[in-house]
Amino acid sequence: MANLKEIRDRIKSVKNTRKITEAMRLVAAAKVRRAQDLVLRSRPFADRLARVLESLQSRIALESADTPLLQARDPRHITLVAMTGDRGLCGGFNANIIKRTEQRFAELKASGYEVALITVGRKVDTYFQNRNYPITASFTGLDQLPTSTDALQVSDAVQAEFLGGATDRVELIYTKFINLVSTKPVSQTLLPLDPQGIASPDDEIFRFVTKEGELGVERSSASNQEDKLKSDLVFEQSPSQLLDVLLPLYLQNQVLRSLQESAASELASRMTAMNNASDNAKALAKELTLDYNKARQAAITQEILEVVGGASAMA
């Protein structure tokens, strides 16, 4: 059994570690609430933009519009946009995206496509850089609570590659926020934009709520939103001109939403991981305290036996 000093040092170390993990859990919980505020502030613009596009879609055949972002090509070159965080200590959040990206990359290569990556986040960038994957652009050091400026950087790079002919299709791989204890890596086609996917019934928005002192999440369908545009609304510009302006905004908004969901997932994963670490540290400290008490009791008993033995020898 370890001596008393070693056990005391371990107990002190575990308790100090628990203070750190508990502080990180509280910070993550606070940032999750701030992530909610970002989503709520950006939602009115996103909703209005989707309704304008929906109104245009109902008046013209978007498939026949001469708009580059809508033009589907015979894909030969495909770009994967993978989103992780810049830091660790968030459970399997980063590893799950890296694994899914590797699998998708291998699937596409096996099917004969030329595949490249755009990385968002230091973890995914470092991983694939070290393994010499073809990376055409990388974004690190973005705000932990993503803004439209962050999304614009990514969407501009994606749009430039697509319009320049460097890629025929862009797929986005990120973590979908389900609730505070559950997230899911998902992938979706980002470009070419699908006009039928605008304001689809499956499009969900999430809102963080507090109920009975516990932080939770509510999801609602975008199709349930009210305030539709009036059917007699007149657009002065031609449909093609409007689409050339609005579709890049829609692309940026799609990227922003993915960044925000990914950030919320990272914060929730970190909060859960640090909560588990704090619980484990508490249990370990309790176990070490029991070991310390046993060792101390054994030492006292041994001293008593030595005293008794010495007294018996002198008698």
Swiss-Prot record:
Gene Ontology CC: plasma membrane-derived thylakoid membrane; proton-transporting ATP synthase complex
Record keywords: ATP synthesis, CF(1), Hydrogen ion transport, Ion transport, Membrane, Thylakoid, Transport
Cross-referenced InterPro entries: ATP_synth_F1_ATPase_gsu, ATP_synth_F1_gsu, ATP_synth_F1_gsu_CS
Disulfide bridge map: none
Keyword Signal part of the UniProt annotation: no
Topology versus the membrane: Peripheral membrane protein
Location within or outside the cell: Cellular thylakoid membrane
Alphabetized CDD domains for the sequence: F1-ATPase_gamma
Main location as per UniProt: membrane
GO MF, one example: proton-transporting ATP synthase activity, rotational mechanism
Pfam families reported for this sequence: ATP-synt
Thylakoid keyword on record: yes
Coiled coil: none
Subunit structure: F-type ATPases have 2 components, CF(1) - the catalytic core - and CF(0) - the membrane proton channel. CF(1) has five subunits: alpha(3), beta(3), gamma(1), delta(1), epsilon(1). CF(0) has three main subunits: a, b and c.
NCBIfam families: ATPsyn_F1gamma, PRK05621.1-2
Annotated family: Belongs to the ATPase gamma chain family.
Record function comment: Produces ATP from ADP in the presence of a proton gradient across the membrane. The gamma chain is believed to be important in regulating ATPase activity and the flow of protons through the CF(0) complex.
Record protein name field: ATP synthase gamma chain
Organism, as annotated: Synechococcus sp. (strain RCC307)
